[in-house]
Amino acid sequence: MKPNNKMLFIGITGGVGAGKSEILSYIRKHYKCEIYLSDEVAHLVKLPGTECFDKLVKLLGAEILDENGQINKKVMADKIFADKSLLKQVNEIVHPAVKEYLLEHLELARQSGEVELFCVEAALLIETGYGSLVDEMWYIYADEEVRAKRLKSARGYTDEKIQRIMASQLSEEQFRQASNFVIDNSGALAESYRQIDKKLEAYTWQE
């Protein structure tokens, strides 16, 4: 199988409640793709036996481990929030490990010759420097009112929690400036899907 030099490496980002998971589900169903969620990859690179795991235990102590010897996410988060200086150190351990994992699988996908789209989803893709790595950065947009309604309905978030999370993320303007393509996901999903297909219709490998 020849490497697929036409494979697109796409970063999928957007604010909380924008509907990134629905967009990714559609892409997964209709295109020959591999999709990686940064949160899931971060979990994998922190499993026992990895270099990332060893570094985190050395930094934070064995008290972050559960009875099975794995990192307890809540305990680790509580420890980090209690000492903000630890957050930067943890990010400096985890983010490079995630990036290395993704780039290894990117090359494997390209060499397979069978993958058309290699997609990576994360809220912090732009902040963590993926803009210089991806072929295209896609911003999944939905207005704040729509996002807040979704978060209340699907996750039971309070207004205070929603505002706190939104305030910690990039602004709409910052997302747009760093992206090649914007999908307006404020309305019906069918319209969002149409935007995706129109964007990708120029590629001859589309099914």
Locate each region found by the language model.
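Walker A/P-loop
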Residues: 21
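Small-molecule kinase domains that catalyze NTP-dependent phosphoryl transfer to phosphate-bearing small molecules
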Residues: 102, 132, 153, 157-202, ...
